[in-house]
Amino acid sequence: MQQSTLLKPVSCYGIGVHSGKRTQLTIEPAKENTGIIFIRTDISSENNYIEASYFNVSDTLLSTTISNDHKVQISTIEHLMAALWGCSIDNAIIKIDGPEVPIMDGSSKPFVFMIECAGKKLQNAPKKYLKILKDIKVVHKDCELYCTPSDHMTVDLTIDFSSKAIGRQNLSFRDQESFTKNIADARTFGFIRDVDYLKSKGLAQGASFENAIGIDEQDKILNPNGLRYEDEFVRHKLLDLFGDLYTNGTSIVSAIKGYKTSHALNNELLHRIFSDTTSYKFVTSSEL
């Protein structure tokens, strides 16, 4: 299997869910073995370049933020990263004129639509995979995430909220190609009781029912059109997981299981994997 990029550039406008700032984002084709690169076009210097890598993740509070050595950062990259993973885009340059990726409708679907509109181009280089060779586990209180060796990528994810609107939900995922149909349109969510506090901390400045599922104090869904799926919450957590894990630069070949995962836990798993060179190897499709 070959690496792929976009056939042509594609752009969108939107606001950041936390910053509330309106930005333009463009996804452009990139050469083989480039990976995913973000460029802050509002910063006119060579310091505006950030590789979308797990080791550049600088903040995981409510979203995933990447930064470079010059303290230039881009936040809320996970929904776009999930779309790139789900569409099997290995190489892309992402130009953005602000500090946060637009939230769009709160899911990955608008980014998937953009990529599909641009088209995909196969490249003259083999696609790489990260194959897990031993059991790896990360735990924080009652939250855990672990991966074990497997010949295929599988994910089993469970979430557990005290809110009756969410409760305990479980989802198993075994086919990357089904991401765009079954996972990509699952939206982010939040509780109305937290809004004032988040806004006081400079977060959720752009949040609305147009880009997030809102849950009130009586555990009712406030969005006029309700949910897209009965288990939309766990689907979105799975979306976040894929986006965060794609900061390793490849698709992971492993059986992955998670309970009450978070952006922090997702990133910690990658650090744990790459801290032990005997726990993984990079392979091509012919070596799987």
From Swiss-Prot:
Keywords: Hydrolase, Lipid A biosynthesis, Lipid biosynthesis, Lipid metabolism, Metal-binding, Zinc. It is an enzyme of class 3 (hydrolase). Its cofactor is Zn(2+). It catalyses: a UDP-3-O-[(3R)-3-hydroxyacyl]-N-acetyl-alpha-D-glucosamine + H2O = a UDP-3-O-[(3R)-3-hydroxyacyl]-alpha-D-glucosamine + acetate. It comes from the Bacteria. One of its GO terms (biological process) is lipid A biosynthetic process. Signal peptide: none annotated. Its EC number is 3.5.1.108. Pathway: Glycolipid biosynthesis; lipid IV(A) biosynthesis; lipid IV(A) from (3R)-3-hydroxytetradecanoyl-[acyl-carrier-protein] and UDP-N-acetyl-alpha-D-glucosamine: step 2/6. Transmembrane segments: none annotated. The active site is at residue 263. The keyword Repeat does not apply. GO terms for cellular component: membrane. Zn(2+) binds at residues 79, 236, 240. GO terms for molecular function: metal ion binding; UDP-3-O-acyl-N-acetylglucosamine deacetylase activity. InterPro entries: Ribosomal_Su5_D2-typ_SF, UDP-acyl_GlcNac_deAcase, UDP-acyl_GlcNac_deAcase_C, UDP-acyl_N-AcGlcN_deAcase_N. Catalyzes the hydrolysis of UDP-3-O-myristoyl-N-acetylglucosamine to form UDP-3-O-myristoylglucosamine and acetate, the committed step in lipid A biosynthesis. Belongs to the LpxC family. This is UDP-3-O-acyl-N-acetylglucosamine deacetylase. It comes from Rickettsia africae (strain ESF-5). The gene is lpxC.
